[in-house]
């Protein structure tokens, strides 16, 4: 395992729920630690079509514009994934924007049990004032240094999206360090603002105590976690944690 490389992964798929859905394209871009300790994008990055073994639905074609003819004759996921997820020389971690999605398809068996960095969760911590935390909003809100506009297009294709994510990851690694990003990624997302309902868009510190405590019982894991952290900030203790469904598509 190389302690000097994190591989950013982006997948385009036939849907969001394997095994009913499958991968039709994988893109990657490495971020490498230099001799001076700074992290920078590696020169190499690429993408490969993947045969999903089923037709691509029109609703997902409309997102990434990958058609059945594009993937016909490509390698199957189980055959192509290990070499990309476990590159020669190793990687200290894999990364993705909303990594929970990629992890549905990049199973521990395929990735060799790789650790993951979620650049979405890390963005919530490092750039809480961003108007949104999607890969593309962060791209234009932050305007990362060195990002080649043409290489980052079209959106919703595997290499361009991985390339954009890698610029966020580079800046996150240089700001907070590898261990911190891994720790943040292992926790639910720390949302800076309420994502829905009557308080949508308000920062947690703007809410009264009763409202904040109410959100600690929310159905969404990220909302509960964020409200609990605000309670801890105010009172020094955490409310009893509940259980509920995993993170939804927020912010």
Feature roles, as predicted:
Residues 2-8, 19-66, 85-202, 210, ...:
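Metal-dependent phosphoesterase core characteristic of DEDDh/y 3'-5' exonuclease domains
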Residues 14:
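Conserved Rossmann-like nucleotide-cofactor binding loop
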Residues 70-80:
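Glycine-rich, highly charged phosphate/nucleotide-binding loops
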Residues 126, 172, 215-219, 234:
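Generic structural signal for hydrophobic core residues of well-folded globular domains
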Residues 206-229:
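Short, surface-exposed, low-complexity cationic segments
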Residues 225-227, 231-244:
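Charged, low-complexity intrinsically disordered segments and flexible loops
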Residues 245-251:
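Short linear clamp-binding motif
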């Amino acid at each position: 395992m190389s302690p000097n490389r994190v591989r950013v992964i982006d997948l385009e798929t036939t849907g969001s729920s394997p095994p009913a859905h499958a991968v039709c394209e994988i893109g990657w871009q490495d971020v490498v630690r230099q001799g001076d300790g700074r992290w920078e994008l590696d020169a190499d990055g690429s993408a490969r079509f993947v045969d999903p073994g089923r037709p691509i639905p029109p609703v997902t074609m409309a997102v990434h514009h990958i058609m059945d003819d594009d993937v016909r004759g490509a390698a199957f996921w189980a055959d192509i994934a290990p070499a990309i997820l476990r590159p020669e020389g190793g990687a200290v971690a894999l990364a993705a924007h909303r990594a929970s999605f990629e992890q549905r398809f990049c199973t521990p068996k395929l990735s060799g049990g790789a650790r993951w960095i979620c650049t979405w969760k890390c963005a919530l911590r490092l750039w809480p004032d961003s108007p949104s935390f999607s890969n593309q909003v962060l791209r234009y809100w932050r305007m990362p240094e060195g990002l080649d506009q043409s290489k980052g297009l079209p959106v919703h294709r595997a290499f361009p999206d991985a390339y954009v994510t890698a610029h966020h990851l580079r800046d996150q690694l240089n700001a907070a360090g590898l261990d911190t990003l891994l720790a943040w990624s292992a926790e639910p997302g720390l949302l800076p603002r309420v994502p829905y309902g009557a308080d949508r868009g308000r920062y947690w510190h703007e809410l009264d105590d009763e409202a904040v405590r109410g959100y600690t019982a929310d159905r969404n894991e990220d909302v509960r976690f964020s409200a609990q952290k605000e309670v801890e900030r105010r009172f020094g203790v955490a409310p009893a944690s509940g259980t509920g469904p995993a993170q939804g598509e927020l912010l």
